[in-house]
Every structure is written in C-alpha cells, then in structure tokens.
C-alpha cells in the first residue's frame, strides 16, 4: 500500500520530537534521534541515504507508551536503526499524526511502519502493531520484518545503485562536454588571434 502522507507537516514532527526528548529526560534515558522535519523531508532524506524510513506513531495514552519509549533508547535498537533507517515519529493526538495513523491503518499501539522511499514514491513494506517494548525484542521484530521483505529491499538497492551509476555517468558526460566546449572556445579564440 502507498500512504498519502504529503500533508504530514514539520510542526507535528518537531512537536513529537520535543515531547519525546522531554519524556526521555523524565525517564532518565538517552533519547533516540527522530528526524524533526516533515514526513516528505524524512522520506527524501531516507531515499538520498539509501535507507528505509521507520515511522513511529506515538500514543501517550497507551499503557505501554513509556516502556516502549524506554526500549527505543536501548543501545541495540539505536545501533540497529543507525545503519538501516531514518526515524520519524508523530503523536496520534495531533491532527497530522491522527491522519497518518488512519492512512497507515494503525490498529494497535505502539505502531511502527517500515517504508521504502524513492523517486517513485513511498511504499509501506512492513508494519508492527503493538510493538514490543524491550530493545532486543524490538530489534528481533524489525529484523524479522526486514528478512521477510529481503527480495523487495534487494531490488530497491539494485535500482538505487543503477540510479547512482546513471547520475555519475551523466555528471561525467556533462563535465566532458563542458571541457570540450572550453577547448573549442580556446581554439576559436586562438584562431581569431592569428
């Protein structure tokens, strides 16, 4: 499924990131770094880094919210995510967070969605409803979801490598063309000077 997420704005993401940091201070645990800009910017960042987007929908009224947030601070979770994901979150009480929750079909919380982002758009490849709060269990759950989507992810990486190679070739061709124009200009100037 392809979520319609363009309207989820910067203010919802920044408010969530700020509230999350405050919660972590209160819980006396180091916060994980959430991308504090619009969904669109987070998706663009994930695509440019050849990473996946991991969306966390936070429901502070849910009984497991604090334990889950504590699990996000585990060294295992942070190390796992640093290599694979751009993390982005929203509070489901905000209008944007609620709209995103509806768009993604979140039925239980905590909720996570793994999204592939490229120039063709975004595609949810896995979601976790009622995610575990323990860092190790959370990593195992996400790793299992990634394993199930291995073929899709490998195809994405091949496409990204092909695009990068095409971009590199285009840049090289543009540079060669500009150098050729400069040589022609210098020859013409030299010919006219003679």
Q: Where do the protein language model's features map onto the residues?
A:
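Intrinsic structural disorder
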Residues: 1-3, 49-50, 70, 189, ...
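N-terminal leader/targeting and pre-domain segments
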Residues: 1-49, 144-160, 167
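Exposed alpha-helical structural elements
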Residues: 18-22, 67, 76, 99, ...
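Short active-site neighborhood of thiol/selenol oxidoreductases, capturing the structured segment around
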Residues: 30, 48-63
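Hydrophobic side chains in beta-strands
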Residues: 56-57, 89, 114, 183
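Charge-rich, low-complexity alpha-helical coiled-coil segments
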Residues: 147-194
């Amino acid at each position: 499924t392809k979520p319609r997420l363009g309207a989820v704005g910067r203010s919802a993401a920044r408010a969530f990131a700020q509230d999350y940091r405050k919660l972590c201070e209160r819980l006396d645990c180091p916060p994980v770094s959430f991308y504090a800009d619009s969904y669109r910017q987070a998706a663009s960042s994930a695509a440019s880094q050849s990473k996946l987007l991991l969306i966390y929908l936070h429901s502070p009224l849910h009984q497991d919210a604090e334990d889950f947030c504590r699990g996000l601070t585990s060294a295992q979770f942070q190390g796992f995510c640093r290599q694979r994901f751009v993390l982005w979150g929203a509070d489901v009480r905000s209008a944007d967070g609620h709209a995103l929750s509806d768009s993604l079909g979140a039925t239980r919380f905590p909720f996570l969605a793994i999204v592939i982002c490229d120039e063709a758009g975004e595609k949810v490849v896995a979601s976790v409803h009622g995610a575990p709060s323990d860092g190790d269990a959370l990593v195992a759950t996400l790793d299992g979801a990634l394993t199930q989507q291995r073929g899709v992810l490998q195809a994405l990486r091949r496409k990204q490598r092909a695009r990068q190679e095409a971009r590199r070739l285009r840049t090289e061709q543009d540079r060669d063309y500009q150098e050729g124009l400069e040589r022609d200009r210098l020859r013409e100037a030299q010919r006219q000077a003679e």
